[in-house]
């Protein structure tokens, strides 16, 4: 935000690490090493296309990490693919609930949605939030609003301990608010 323009889009794939790489993830390193670069983690190729359209109009650099299983999924292509935008820094609530907030991104979103549906069958109402963008992170503080409603949160990803999950928790608990709007402590 210092006024310098750096319109650059870096496209790569990630998530769902396999083989000898299954125990490693670069997300923790990326979010700590690339400050000033938008780090975007779409859950599917439609969302990725929206990020590309958004970043093509931006003067800021962006790293778009496409999920590997997104290449294999059949998706309904939007009729406005060239105009479709995915906003940077804005989370998307993909399932509303009242008992627990599940926060995730990228390829784990499908797994979390399946788990939320299984929880619902057991009488537990889970709200699912797709972060979509690690940097910037939840600029509208929607995760805190959800936690205020459910009083419980679980952060889910495939990163190593201390990586993106720790980053998301720190962003929500320390930087966004340690109290919700009702003055109740968020733990």
What is each stretch, according to the model?
Residues 3-6, 68-187:
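Thiamine diphosphate
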């Amino acid at each position: 935000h210092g006024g310098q323009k750096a319109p650059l889009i870096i496209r790569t794939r990630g998530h769902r690490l396999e083989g000898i790489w299954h125990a490693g993830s670069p997300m923790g390193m990326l979010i700590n090493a690339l400050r000033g670069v938008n780090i975007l983690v779409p859950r599917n190729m439609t969302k990725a296309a929206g990020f590309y359209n958004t970043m093509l109009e931006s003067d800021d650099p962006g790293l778009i990490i496409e999920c590997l299983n997104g290449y294999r999924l059949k998706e309904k292509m939007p009729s406005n693919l060239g105009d479709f935008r995915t906003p940077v820094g804005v989370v998307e609530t993909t399932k509303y609930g009242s008992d627990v907030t599940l926060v995730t991104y990228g390829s784990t979103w499908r797994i979390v949605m399946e788990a939320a549906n299984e929880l619902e069958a057991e009488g537990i109402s889970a709200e699912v939030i797709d972060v979509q963008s690690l940097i910037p992170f939840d600029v509208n503080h929607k995760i805190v609003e959800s936690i205020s409603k459910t009083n419980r949160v679980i952060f889910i990803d495939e990163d190593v301990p201390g990586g993106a999950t720790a980053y998301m928790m720190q962003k929500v608990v320390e930087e966004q608010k340690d109290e919700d709007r009702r003055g109740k402590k968020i733990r």
